[in-house]
């Protein structure tokens, strides 16, 4: 699978790359602005700075470097790129997801399976006037933002970034805390089991024996406050720590302020990357309206249409049964030709068994493909067609993106603006669309279409009925 290599840094990116001063630096930017490229170049030069410190005798042992990514797929992609940036026997490099990094470093109880976690929350919240999906998301938000001894702060806190609907007055928050969250915490202890929030808390409480001199956290908008606290607890007294993020692409319920995790972030140690180097003007114009009514924060960056340097076809919406949708996909891949070296991502909101027909049709057509979802290693062979969930495509980029089967069944939510699940799905769709460099195709069956179709600007796409 082709990795799209970093290009020469721009003058805008060089202001970040050439800032070697120890401390925290935050890189913000919209999809396609080169955030990860900038972070990797910055990593290269900051590691050189620390290598000089090592050679000059200011630090003992190797320069310890940690790169944390959002998921396994992105970890494999970043590792493939980072290998080219970091040289030298005096560097100890770790590239990992937060979960893998944490489970390698703390003794832990078994991690709850998703069905156990969700089943218990659903049972505890049955009497609340809230949907199951919202309760799960809100509980994850609370347990990710507040440490176990400060959970009551949730009752009066500002829930910025959590949407305007459903409303959560203090009385309902108190019920959620008393009837769901506290009993859930007690139940986990009885089961001698943890969830991912417990892992973050354990890492935040454990002082590392081998702290890191250099840390890069990519896609940091989907890290929880407690995960950030854990990272801060595992750096040397003098360190270089880089967070790379865009809150407009947040697809998990994490929202906190830098101040509440003990960091001061301002113009002196942050940079907004405004230019879009990835998308054509047409793809950026399609993605931008999806975020128009989505609640944003200071860390969000909306795609800048004026900065796109390339023109292309409008995104294409293909209407038909799933069989007809796949007819179009197979024809598109065949039209690229056997010698094609352009990368293609076929994305779905759910993955798993939902990809069964996609795989069967590609196999029947003799078209090779590779899976990307939860793959820890980036596939290095010649195959350039990848299957992935929309979530796992985060942080990646491809020449062509095809989002298949966009239905109300796989992306259910309330229809009113401000609904938290609707906002999350719009961010997910905009993020997925922003993975495409050249073409974007979305397929769906009109009678089962997701309500998100209505959020798209008709002037920004073409329609093909098959």
Write out the residue ranges for each language-model feature:
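Short amphipathic alpha-helical boundary/capping segments
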Residues: 2-8, 124-128
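N-terminal pre-P-loop "Q-motif" helix
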Residues: 4-23, 196-199
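Conserved helicase motor core of SF1/SF2 NTP-dependent helicases
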Residues: 6, 11, 25-56, 62-63, ...
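Generic hydrophobic alpha-helical segments
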Residues: 13-16, 43, 117-128, 199, ...
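A long, hydrophobic alpha-helical segment
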Residues: 19, 58-59
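Short coil/turn segments at secondary-structure boundaries
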Residues: 30-31, 151-156, 194-201
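ATP-hydrolysis module of ASCE/P-loop NTPase motor domains
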Residues: 108-175
């Amino acid at each position: 699978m082709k990795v799209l290599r970093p290009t020469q840094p721009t003058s805008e990116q060089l202001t970040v790359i050439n800032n070697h001063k120890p401390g925290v630096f935050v890189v913000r930017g919209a999809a396609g602005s080169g955030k990860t490229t900038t972070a990797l170049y910055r990593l290269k030069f900051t590691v050189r700075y620390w290598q000089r410190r090592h050679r000059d005798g200011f630090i003992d042992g190797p320069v310890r470097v940690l790169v944390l990514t959002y998921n396994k797929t992105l970890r494999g992609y970043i590792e493939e790129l980072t290998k080219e940036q970091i040289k030298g026997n005096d560097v100890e490099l770790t590239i990992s997801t937060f979960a893998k990094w944490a489970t390698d470093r703390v003794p832990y109880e078994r991690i709850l399976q998703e069905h156990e976690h969700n089943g218990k929350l659903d049972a505890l919240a049955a009497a609340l006037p809230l949907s199951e999906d919202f309760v799960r998301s809100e509980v994850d938000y609370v347990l990710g933002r507040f440490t176990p001894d400060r959970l009551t702060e949730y009752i009066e806190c500002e829930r910025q970034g959590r949407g305007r609907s459903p409303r959560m007055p203090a009385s309902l928050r108190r019920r959620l805390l008393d009837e769901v969250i506290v009993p859930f915490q007690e139940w986990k202890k009885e089961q001698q089991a943890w969830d991912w929030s417990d892992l973050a808390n354990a890492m935040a409480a454990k002082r590392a024996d081998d702290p890191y001199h250099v840390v890069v956290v990519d896609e940091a908008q989907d890290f929880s406050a407690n995960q950030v606290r854990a990272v801060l607890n595992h750096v040397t007294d003098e360190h270089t720590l880089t967070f790379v993020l865009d809150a407009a692409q947040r697809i998990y319920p994490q929202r906190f302020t830098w101040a509440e995790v003990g960091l001061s972030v301002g113009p002196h140690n942050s940079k907004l990357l405004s230019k879009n180097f990835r998308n054509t003007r047409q793809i950026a114009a399609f993605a931008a309206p999806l975020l128009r009514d989505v609640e944003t924060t200071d860390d969000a960056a909306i795609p800048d249409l004026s900065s796109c340097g390339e023109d292309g076809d409008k995104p294409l919406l293909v209407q038909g049964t799933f069989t007809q949708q796949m007819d179009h996909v197979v024809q598109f891949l065949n039209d690229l030709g056997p010698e094609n070296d352009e990368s293609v991502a076929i994305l779905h909101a759910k993955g798993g068994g939902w990809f069964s027909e996609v795989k069967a049709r590609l196999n029947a057509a003799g078209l090779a493909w590779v899976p990307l979802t939860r793959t820890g290693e980036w596939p290095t062979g010649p195959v350039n067609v990848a299957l992935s969930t929309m979530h796992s495509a985060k942080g990646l980029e491809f020449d062509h993106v095809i989002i298949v089967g966009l239905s109300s069944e796989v992306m259910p939510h309330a229809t009113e603006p401000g609904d938290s699940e609707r906002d999350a799905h719009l961010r997910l769709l905009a993020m997925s669309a922003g993975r495409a460099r050249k073409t974007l195709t979305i397929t769906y069956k009109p009678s089962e279409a997701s309500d998100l179709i209505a959020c798209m600007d008709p002037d920004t796409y073409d329609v093909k009925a098959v």
